Amino acid sequence: MGLTQILQNSQITLPNPHLNSLSKITTTNKKIDSNSLPTMSEVMEASKAQKIHLQLQTLGPFFRIAAKSLETQNELGRAEGLIRVWFGGRVLHLDSIRLRRETLGMERSIFGIGLFIGAVAIRYGYERGCGSAELLAINDSELYHSKLVRFYKRIGFKVVHEVTGSSIGDLAHMLVWGGIGTRMDANITELLLKWCTRFKSPN
């Protein structure tokens, strides 16, 4: 899509999602008291406390989230995706999350910067009425792929399919994304509840 851009040579890419899968998540946002969930402003304020500025831009169904250091003004990472209407309702598709390679040496890198970027995306999906989120953790390196899968499991995603290229059913995945990996889904409301203590204001 037109929104996809490469940061610079010193970057690392986290996920790519599969756009053609049907959400199997049944929990709906309206069953949860919205006051118990972290708001977008609370996520933004929590990021500022870590010296990170997050910016959300939207264009039709597409969105882009950029993370910038408040200390250096350098871009630390970026996420892109879209809101898609599917048979089961609206679904949040995370096209990619990219982090600068230099951030990997920071304690707050994947489980910090990546988590903040992901939280903005998930909250945005919730506000747009999405019930679930989908992605594909690309397997272009066994070591890095295992880190990706652990990261997504830690924040609340579940494995639904391994795209290995060994079956005809994997062909569509590989044609769209150009590689193999692990398909993962998550319930958006459950993600926000899981992250509640990290982002929700005490009062």
Locate the predicted segments by residue.
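Non-catalytic substrate-recognition and accessory regions of acyl/acetyltransferase enzymes
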Residues: 2-112, 116-138, 145-165, 169-203
